[in-house]
Amino acid sequence: MVSFTLRAIGACLVSLPALVTAAPTSHISGDFQVLEQLHEVPQGWVQTGSPAPSSQLKFKLALQQDKAAAFEQHVMDISNPKHENYGKHMTQEEVDAFLQPPAHMTDSVFNWLASEGIPKHSIKADTDWLTFTTTVQKAEKLLNTRFYNFKNTIDNTQVIRTLQYSVAETVAPYVHMIQPTTKFSAPRPELSSVFTSDLEITSSADVDCNVTITPDCIRDLYKMGNTFAKKDPRNRLGISGYLEQYARLDDFSTFIDMFVPSLKGTTFDFKSINGGKNEQNSSLDSVEASLDVDYAIGLSGALSTYYGTAGRGMLIPDLDQPNITNNNNEPYLEQLHYLLGLPDSELPAVLSTSYGENEQSVPKKYTDSACHLFARLGARGVSVIFSSGDTGVGSACQSNDGKKITKFNPIFPAACPFVTSVGGTHQINPEVAIHFSSGGFSERFSRPWYQELDVNHYLQHELEHGKWDGMYNPSGRGFPDVSAQSYKFATRDHGRTIGVSGTSASAPLFAGVVSILNSIRLAHHKPRLGFLNPWLYTIGRSGFTDIVHGGSDGCTGTDQYSHLPTPYVPGASWNATRGWDPVTGLGTPNFETLSKLVLQY
């Protein structure tokens, strides 16, 4: 991706005794049950002392969700064009009613929090999630642990975290997770490459599409003609913004004038989440934001909103990312809860996100919870699209569980079964897989039914027998689902025209295509596409051009982010093959065909 991989810059691991003072201590009476813990402390971190007892920490508590499996099956059903309930998206009220936990569960957790000094009136309840703010002193007593300041020895950033936390046994059956506690992370843009010299072009007429990509190149390659989405509030295109990436209106306006003059005057709205800003005169890096708005909106022409979310996440560091910030807020949860709290009429129809992180760098309870929230967006008719990543088979190529096993690294959220993951290609005539396109198989999520036949075919007939055994999970969710161009996109940023590469070009590109397909459906009185994958792997598959040349790479012996030494795997790669493959998915879009297929159901 020029995607922001919430990438985990690496960190070798040291044993727990190296930081025993950070380990949880049973310091209050009563029985507790450990909810989450880290196996080891990452190298590159030092304990710098204890936070002030009065320091404020904001927590999100996820209640156990006994109806998750039934709900997710319902989302699959309403997204399956062969099912009688296809297209019957749920309202906000229907989702909340379906997932509302039993009153005794919520009451028990409320009472537990109140008994530990957290006033009930300060606890915000949102279906099966609770949000509360408390002091370090109270949090330590509540969670039977000790919080410490940790400093990263690479960039000197600090964070307040613990290695383990517990909850009272009386409420343990009701609490799924509480964060931020053990999730150390810092999202960062994963720039596959940004060409620092200015592009000597002023319009699409100056471009060789084998060298530089513009909207006209994409329209020609994917047979889009001059079709744009109508500006319809039912078909809003949402673009995720994190990490103080500001989408500049002047740059966007110039890009449209240069490359899509038929959309002259088109702009986008901005919505702030958790205090997020969209400063127009900042000197901070904004290539990711510029790329996203230029191509998602420049291709679709849809009514669009840039969602700027403040805060940075926390991670279980691995060889990609020992990079942490002192901000306690996790952007995915902040954004997801904001969006799910919107009335149905204000939800985006398509949400494009060009960010990701190594799946292993995120606690399992967290990936499960976040993926389920993506399913809730799908239930309400939102197509959630993520770039697959820019590390090929992997960059760290080592487990971070203390065992240091050499393996490929799947990407989250790209490997969540309820998002559509977009890989990367380059060149035209023929279009081929690009080497950095991330793909593979989840170690957290099992393979969903909609891709069972395709992935099994790849494993049994296209992948050399025994190749890469032990390096990946052959029963995991395969990604990406589809792919699109990802190399040297002409982009306006800070008043310059530059070239940018990454699957974070592929994601907004594909989001623009989906937005136009939604517009076609709405014009024919059909519902929005919503969660795409069951449709893509059934009806939609014939609307994609199979990419059979090229492949990914990775595991080169040097981490591409931290530049630390990593395991070297000679020839590490997934090849583009006939049918689905873990580099390009089902292939690249043929809009001419898709525009007809989209009206069949």
From Swiss-Prot:
SMART domains: Pro-kuma_activ. The keyword Acyltransferase does not apply. It is an enzyme of class 3 (hydrolase). Its cofactor is Ca(2+). GO terms for cellular component: extracellular region. InterPro entries: Peptidase_S8/S53_dom, Peptidase_S8/S53_dom_sf, Peptidase_S8_Ser-AS, S53_propep, Sedolisin_dom, Tripeptidyl-peptidase_I. One of its GO terms (biological process) is proteolysis. One of its GO terms (molecular function) is tripeptidyl-peptidase activity. It is found in: Secreted, Extracellular space. Its main location: secreted. This is Tripeptidyl-peptidase SED4.
